[in-house]
Amino acid sequence: MTASAHDSHSGTGSSALATIDWRGRPIRIEHQWIAPERTAAPLVVFLHEGLGSVAMWKDFPTQLCNAGGFRGLVFSRPAYGRSTPRDADETWDVDFMHRQAHEVLPALFDVLGIREQPWLFGHSDGGSISLLYAAHAPDCVAGLVVLAPHLFVEDLTITNIEAAREAYLNTDLPKKLGRYHDDADSAFWGWNRIWLHPPFRQWNIEAELDAIRCPVLAVQGVDDEYGTLQQIRGIASRVHRTQLLELPDCGHSPHKDQPQQVIDATVSFINQWRQP
C-alpha cells in the first residue's frame, strides 16, 4: 500500500482531506487537527464508532485536548463522514477492523507525517481498531484509551444492531445520519451488514491482545446497550498495564453520557504514563 499527500496539517477548526491508496484505489480521508501548534505535547488520535465521523465527535476532542494541553487528530474512516464513500456493491469482510488497523491507520499516519508514538482514543469499533493496531505494531503507540470496545460478539450487541436496522428502515435515522456523512447509506449498511453477517458471530480478538505492551485505559458504561463489562474486563485479564473505569448511569457512549469523568480520567492517565 502507498500513501500520497493530498492535504496535510490544516490547523484547528476545519477539516481537510488526505489521500491514501487502499484496496487498489485512491481513498480520501477527512481529518482535522486540534492545536497543532502544541508541537511538544502528546498527540491523541481519535477513532470513531461504527456510525461515527469527524463531525459526530462534536467538540469533545477539543475539550479533551484543551484540558490536557494535548494535540489532537480526528479523522473519518473510509465510508464515513466526508471520506470516500463505500461503493454500493462493496461488502466488508469479517476482518474489516483488522484491515483498518493494519492498513488504513499506518497509511494515514504516513501521509500525514506522523512519526512519533501517538495515543489512540477509540470508541466502540474505533476502540477495537485501536487495540488491534497496538497489538500489530506495539512499538508504534504510546498508549490507548478505549471506550466501549468490542473484543467478541455478544447476543446483546446483535439484538441492538438488529434494532438499529429497523430504525434505519422505518424512521428518520437516515436523515439524521446524513448530517454527519456525505453518504449515509455507505456508512450505515457497511457497518450493519457485517455485524449481522452470520460468520461475524465468531469474530474474537481476545488472543491478539497478548501482544499489546503499552498502557491501556478501558472505559465502559454499566448500562452499555451494545456490550457487557466482560468486554473491558477481558482487556485487563490480558494486558498488564490496564486501568478499568466502569461508569454508572452511562450507556455505550461514555464521552457523551459522562464527558467530564472521561476527560479527567484520560488526562490523568496520559500524564501518568507519558514520557518526560
Specify the residue positions occupied by each region the protein language model found:
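Acidic catalytic loop of the alpha/beta-hydrolase fold
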Residues: 223-227
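Short beta-strand/loop motif that positions the catalytic acidic residue
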Residues: 212, 218-220
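Catalytic histidine neighborhood in serine/cysteine hydrolases
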Residues: 237-253
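Conserved hydrolase catalytic core segment
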Residues: 116-154
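Active-site loop/oxyanion-hole signature of alpha/beta-hydrolase fold enzymes
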Residues: 74-117
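Catalytic active-site module of serine/aspartate enzymes centered on a nucleophile-bearing elbow/loop
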Residues: 249-276
